[in-house]
Amino acid sequence: NQPKQYKHSLIHNDYKYDNVVFSSDSWTKINSILDWEMCTIGDPLMDLGTSIAYWAMASDPKVLKAAFDYPTSLEGNPSRLEVVEMYEKQTGEPVNNLVFYYVFGLFKIAVIVQQIYYRYSKGLTTNEKFKNLNKIAEILCKIGWQSIQKNRIENLF
């Protein structure tokens, strides 16, 4: 279900909670976006797909919530679908092929964590939090497969 046509824009390519700085007077206002080394020209929905792939929810497997230790799984945060609805409202554009963008985001993150795990397994980095990243990559792929099979991005297990 890869989109046949898409828009082009500058995309961040790693848009997630720990790459934004929130306003000191409002946690819902972003003051700046950090970490632009992966930016490129591409489909802006790729940023949305990556963001919701990082978006851990309370209903997700525990290991995924532990891997992405973001406040997104806490009560009061929107679900992935609610994030997509907000995106549609802000842009005035429908998000078609949502599963494609979500699964692409999961795959991209799986590749990133495999690269980090490889460096850890070769002793090139020693941070113990990297020792289970190979399992995280496997889980991300399973989530992607479930998303494709069920044609949705939530309630996959």
Each predicted region: which residue ranges?
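All-alpha amphipathic helical-bundle segments outside canonical DNA-binding/catalytic cores
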Residues: P94-G105
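Regulatory N- and C-terminal appendages and interdomain linkers associated
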Residues: V111, Q115-F157
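Active-site activation/catalytic loop segments of kinase-like enzymes and analogous catalytic loops
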Residues: M46-T91, G105-K122
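An alpha-helical support segment within catalytic cores of ATP-dependent transferases
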Residues: N1-N13, Y17, S23-T28, E85-G92
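A cross-family kinase active-site recognition segment
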Residues: N1-S9, M38-G42, L124-A137
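Short, solvent-exposed loop/turn segments at secondary-structure junctions
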Residues: K16-D18, C39, G105
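Catalytic activation segment of kinase domains across protein kinase-like and atypical kinase folds
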Residues: V20-K62
